[in-house]
Amino acid sequence: MRRTKLRFLWLSLATFVFPLWAQDSHPSCNKCSGTYIASDEIQAYLNRSPRDAVVTDQQVRAVDVGKSNVDIGVVYRNKTAGGAVAEHDLVSEVYHVIDGSATLVVGWDITDLKRRPADDRAVRLLNGPGGNGASIRNGATYQLKPGDVVIIPAGVGHWFTKIDDHISYLMVRIDPDKVTPPKDEAASKADLAGAGR
């Protein structure tokens, strides 16, 4: 009886478990290179942000990493007592606050949501299809300061309800559907030289 159980166990392992160990896993971005962005380049984008603009959202890189794009942006927002809610259908965002402070509300229950047109700059170049709304019901409120990080999944509204003086942040956009166009170092340098304005 005991031998029968042991044989059954080994047969089960040989049939189901061992083949799993033998499977090769392959990277989703075979032989891709890493991407480096110097702090001087980030600072150059921040320095060219007009201080009289309500918001300046600039794409620094958009990199194909296999099954997804990962984009890096720099955003500068001026003092305001509110603005529109933003929502992106396909692109998630991660904010890392560099400077300044603000109140950010995040949530999925967006009032008076209206779609952005397909030819909108943000839709074409930054974060794909989405919409803007009037407010967020029952959202989470965060008091952002330098060093803070916020993760905003695709489809979730985000709304700066108050910016004390200004806020600047590095943004990582996760774009699994590759809706944003690629932007490499050469394109970034051309952008900074004035060709992308």
Identify the function of each model-found stretch.
Residues 91, 138-139, 146:
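Short, solvent-exposed loop/turn positions at domain surfaces
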Residues 165-181:
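A short hydrophobic beta-strand segment most commonly corresponding to one strand
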Residues 89-108, 119-132:
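Short, conserved beta-strand element in jelly-roll/cupin
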